[in-house]
Amino acid sequence: MSEERSKISLRSGGKRKNRPTISAPRQISAPIPQDNGMPQPPPEATMADEPRMTRPRPPPPGGKTSDLVKKRYSTRFGNMPTDFDPSSNPMPALPDLEKYMQAQVGSPPSRGGDAGGLGPMGREPPRVDIRTLRDPNFAPEQYVAEVLGEATEDEIRDYEDALKQLKARAAADLQQNVYQNRTQFIKISKEAEKLKGEMRTLRNLMLELKTNTTALRASSNSADSSGSLGPEFSTGLSKRDRRSSITDRTALWSAQMQALYKSVEGSQKFLPNSQGRHVVQNAGPWIELDNATYKSRRSMQIFLLNDHLLIASRKKRKIDGPGADARGPMTKLVADRCWHLLDVEVVDMAGTGDSSNGRNKLADAIMVRGGGQNESFIYRTEKPEDPEKTTLILNIRKTVEELRRNLQSERDATNKAKETINYFASRDPGLLQKTELLETLSDIKDMLIEVDGKQQNLRWVESQMDELDINIALQQIEPAVARIEMLKNLASGLKNNMIAQDFISFKVDERCARLATLVVRELVNSHNDQKKTKRNVTWLVRLGFEDRAREAYLEARSEVIQKRSRQCIFQGDLHLYIWEISFVYFMVIRNTVICFQSCFPPPMMSACVKWAKEEVDAFNVILARQLSSAEEGGEVWTECVNRAKEHASMLSDVGLDFRNLVGRNVGTSTTVPGGASAGLGLS
């Protein structure tokens, strides 16, 4: 191997006849095809074949050694890959960069010279800072000096417009919040009132449940707690007559009281007959005890009524007197004491007293305490451990609770009636002048009316009035007029309920007058706009105030004529002054008649014609006053009158011909009909 290597040298060797030619380096734009002796087609043009601005390279120096070095360090590419497509681009297509460039490129400068939100001086224009304005320590002078110190007139005007918009938006938000809070307050008040009634009902039900539970417990503890009057108070009524109907119950109670009057002497003096009064329990015989020694004093009998407690004493009947019935009972009952249940207190004496003898002496006793003189009496049952005591105490408690509940219901009903009167009167002070309607308010608090097939009370009417008040306050004229029409139709349909009809009509008429005042004021302010005038007149006609609308409109037009005529200044030229005055009068009259014909109903046109004639008469007064210095029939006089008649011919466009009235009695008219002021041509 060494010998072979020694024979190979770069400087020596056999001379070759055909030396390879090494060309200069060139840029490769396509894979070099394998040298297989076959002619290859020229590669297609690619992106690399585009013309390039390359600098020409000087030809390398030739030589044997340089050719060998170039051959040694040359590179040869292998075969092409199997998936190579010579017709495809050597690199993927570039994405569209235009959409990325648009985000970076700003908007073109405006015509005013502002670029990028900067002012004309290359600074940002002043902006309204809401946080600074909300600062409690806000100093207006300092803020204006800092923000608008270097601002231009246009920037100050824009800043002022921004402040006005902010103020308008804040005012609108404040007004919306006020009426929203008022609506919520009304809704909450209604819910609170409804909840109050439900709580009152719940309380009554709980008291009734407590009473029934106590009565059931007493019935379970005692086998005989029917509370009948005994054999001597038998009314002779059968079980059928004791049904729970109101008529039978009233008859039963009346029979009980008659039996009580017959059996207890003097009881009618303490307990006069009244509706609903009846006997709850005949407690049977009792013994009155001394308060100090607890010794027996006399025999008594206790009767419990639904509102009183009657104590009757037992006395021996005299049988030796004239007319005495020997077959009757040996004793009689005489009414001794009687108290109202709410004036006394019944106390169970069990647990008090001396129990050294085995059984407590007061175990079967009760104490009745109270009355007008704050006295106390002790009563004990004749039989020890008599169940009448327990039954009497339970019945007294039950009766007292029922009595208090009935009184509370009556008091609540009275208060509710007063609240109803105060409620309606406070909302509409005008009701205080309606004495007849005010007296019936307590009767209509629960009155129901039919609205669209549903039963509604008058509080629903009040809610509609609240909505109407809100519409009027917000100057929402169309919803307010529609609601008034609905309520008027509702009131007219209540022919069988005159109280509710008068109540609704009174409230609707009051708000209707208030709304009409608002629309009339708007009509006077916008009488020059025919579209607004027609809208306002339509509202007033729907409200029933067409006469008021006509008077307000014609009066406003008369004021316009007076105002425009006073603006005509007399500067020495009588003909020019008469021309101006006549043009003002007849042009305004013509426009008024045109607007009146399109806005008001046709039957009212006669009022407009009458008004036009009055204005022509007022013009004649002015004309006569101005021509008083001119010779009647002269050139100046004739020219002025003819000019006035020429302007009066404009009324023929609206169907009026007042040319014969112009200049009539000019030489004698000196006053304005109806007291209207006459223009003197003075500034």
Swiss-Prot record:
Localisation: Cytoplasmic vesicle, Secretory vesicle
GO BP terms, alphabetized: exocytosis; Golgi to plasma membrane transport; protein localization; protein transport
Positions with biased composition (Low complexity): 219-228
The keyword Protein transport belongs to this UniProt entry's keyword annotation: yes
Keywords tagged on the record: Coiled coil, Cytoplasmic vesicle, Exocytosis, Protein transport, Transport
Main location: cytoplasm
Gene3D superfamilies per record: Exo84p, C-terminal helical domain (1.20.58.1220), Exo84p, N-terminal helical domain (1.20.58.1210), Pleckstrin-homology domain (PH domain)/Phosphotyrosine-binding domain (PTB) (2.30.29.30)
InterPro entries, sorted: Cullin_repeat-like_dom_sf, Exo84, Exo84_C, Exo84_C_1, Exo84_C_2, PH-like_dom_sf
Residue ranges that the Swiss-Prot or TrEMBL entry lists as coiled coil: 145-213, 388-422
Pfam family, one: PH_EXO84
Entry GO CC: exocyst; transport vesicle
Chain spans, region Disordered: 1-91, 103-125, 217-242
Subunit relationships: Component of the exocyst complex.
Function of the protein: Involved in the secretory pathway as part of the exocyst complex which tethers secretory vesicles to the sites of exocytosis. Plays a role in both the assembly of the exocyst and the polarization of this complex to specific sites of the plasma membrane for exocytosis. Also involved in assembly of the spliceosome.
Family stated for the protein in its record: Belongs to the EXO84 family.
Protein name per Swiss-Prot or TrEMBL: Exocyst complex component exo84
Species: Neurospora crassa (strain ATCC 24698 / 74-OR23-1A / CBS 708.71 / DSM 1257 / FGSC 987)
Organismal lineage: Eukaryota, Fungi, Dikarya, Ascomycota, Pezizomycotina
Gene that encodes the chain: exo84
